[in-house]
């Protein structure tokens, strides 16, 4: 059985959260997700991931158990870049099931050669713990631009 979350349902839920958020940062998190869901071609999954293909690939799609090689850029809701393999001029490689759930889910939707934008609510990112010694604050909604370069079976 396939479950599709409609744009309206996602936008309504996120707007409700934004309307009653006390902290301005919490409102920015919800605003980011709502804006991402409105982008042309965006798909909102049941987990809350907002996936948008920027460039379709033509190679293999990875399984969660595969090792992937990617280039990526990660930003906070305010646009602050917190990490970039592009800046290091070095792609990174990792087992797909060894990263945040947002990446595991989102990268499996890609094909080698493709590029996508993932908007990750905190629940499928770093949650209340945050990461990077405070670089990624607790309960942060994150955006990633990911380019899938290669897939290797584990």
Question: What is the predicted role of each segment?
Answer:
Residues 2-154:
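Cross-family detector of peptidyl-prolyl cis-trans isomerase
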């Amino acid at each position: 059985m396939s479950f599709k979350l409609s744009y309206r349902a996602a936008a309504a839920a996120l707007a409700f959260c934004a309307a009653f958020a006390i902290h301005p940062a919490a409102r920015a998190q919800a605003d980011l997700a709502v804006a991402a869901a409105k982008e042309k071609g965006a798909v909102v999954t049941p987990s809350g991931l907002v996936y948008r293909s920027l460039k379709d690939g033509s190679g293999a799609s990875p399984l969660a158990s595969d090792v992937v090689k990617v280039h990526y850029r990660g930003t906070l809701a305010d646009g602050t870049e917190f990490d970039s393999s592009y800046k290091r001029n070095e792609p990174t490689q990792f087992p797909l099931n060894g990263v945040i759930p947002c990446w595991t889910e989102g990268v499996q939707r890609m094909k080698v050669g493709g590029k996508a934008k993932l908007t990750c609510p905190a629940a499928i990112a770093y949650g209340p713990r945050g990461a990077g010694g405070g670089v990624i604050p607790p309960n942060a909604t994150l955006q990633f631009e990911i380019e899938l370069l290669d897939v290797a079976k584990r």
